[in-house]
């Protein structure tokens, strides 16, 4: 058979003719020929997501194309660099493998290779937490000990903890670094008592150089586990070992947490992470697209970033959803396609913002008056009454201040707004017709 690289290039040329442009560029373009052993052709995919997608969607297409070119029936297998044995296909060696030289009861570091400082996107909401984490990684137990990072789900706390672990190991391969969740700590502690191995458990976690413990809030209410962690914390701190803790809330807000633990968490530095702003969300999407080898138009990234503002996980998940949807329906990725792909998840997470001008527009339609009438000095009932309804709704359905509402209604005094609100509120108690009118207007606004 001809050179495998030439064969795969020919196959790609044929496959490109059979697929839509977005499907080919998203899934096939970044693949590479790896090896041919027996009747198995192995192809390298750039990442796990691409590998899984190729296996589920394009195996038969590739096998048929190879058969057309060679007349041979070959099975096709996809791999990613991390899964292959050849040295040139492996990622940079992780120096944490030195941990294998430790006794078998020493816990594995359990660090995610994707979570490093290089892959962390810095923004206004996480800049301080990132700087503190880097300082701790550069000088364990000398900068801030403990470092306590808190914030909502999916904002990057775990990423920073893993990044600290990687940095420490990269600069000190013999360092004993352990990452675990408080739930795992609790389960192992319970098992150690049941199996009469409490001493082994204590030795395991009190002989590390860096302890990274995630979601500490789950220790709340677990008195025995808190007792054990209290002594583990004391031992490590007294021996100048670094402790990094994460939580979804600051120590003072964790219920049923012992005061002595709470005070120790406050010994070092407490820093929070807040949801990313628009610029950071766009940067996160760009980095994710680059890492996955995806070609995403700027307008699509802007659309997703504007719609998903809760956390990073949902943001990246939305991007993958758009890419998958594009491939399924064989259409180019654009803002309209993104809106269609995300229509099921955006409404619940992105409530409509109601403005005073929108209220005036809808009320004007219902009562057949012009927009300028809301700001005019007219006092005829046909204008004044709808104006009062619009003022009432502006007070009820927006966050605007009384002066702001008055300004939007021709510069009227805030007392006029108060009077309108009180009048409509009283009328709504008994006036069923007005109740129905206001209900219909609210439905139109929503």
From Swiss-Prot:
It holds the Pfam family DnaA_N. InterPro entries: AAA+_ATPase (IPR003593), Chromosome_initiator_DnaA (IPR001957), Chromosome_initiator_DnaA-like (IPR020591), Chromosome_initiator_DnaA_CS (IPR018312), DnaA_C (IPR013159), DnaA_dom (IPR013317), DnaA_N_dom (IPR024633), DnaA_N_sf (IPR038454). Keywords: ATP-binding, Cytoplasm, DNA replication, DNA-binding, Lipid-binding, Nucleotide-binding. Residues 72-109 are annotated as: Domain II. One of its GO terms (molecular function) is DNA replication origin binding. GO terms for cellular component: cytoplasm; plasma membrane. CDD domains: AAA (cd00009), Bac_DnaA_C (cd06571). GO terms for biological process: DNA replication initiation; regulation of DNA replication. Residues 110-326 are annotated as: Domain III, AAA+ region. It is found in: Cytoplasm. PROSITE patterns: DNAA. Oligomerizes as a right-handed, spiral filament on DNA at oriC. PANTHER family: CHROMOSOMAL REPLICATION INITIATOR PROTEIN DNAA (PTHR30050:SF2). Domain I is involved in oligomerization and binding regulators, domain II is flexibile and of varying length in different bacteria, domain III forms the AAA+ region, while domain IV binds dsDNA. Plays an essential role in the initiation and regulation of chromosomal replication. ATP-DnaA binds to the origin of replication (oriC) to initiate formation of the DNA replication initiation complex once per cell cycle. Binds the DnaA box (a 9 base pair repeat at the origin) and separates the double-stranded (ds)DNA. Forms a right-handed helical filament on oriC DNA; dsDNA binds to the exterior of the filament while single-stranded (ss)DNA is stabiized in the filament's interior. Belongs to the DnaA family. This is Chromosomal replication initiator protein DnaA. It comes from Bacillus velezensis (strain DSM 23117 / BGSC 10A6 / LMG 26770 / FZB42) (Bacillus amyloliquefaciens subsp. plantarum). The lineage of its organism: Bacteria, Bacillati, Bacillota, Bacilli, Bacillales. The gene is dnaA.
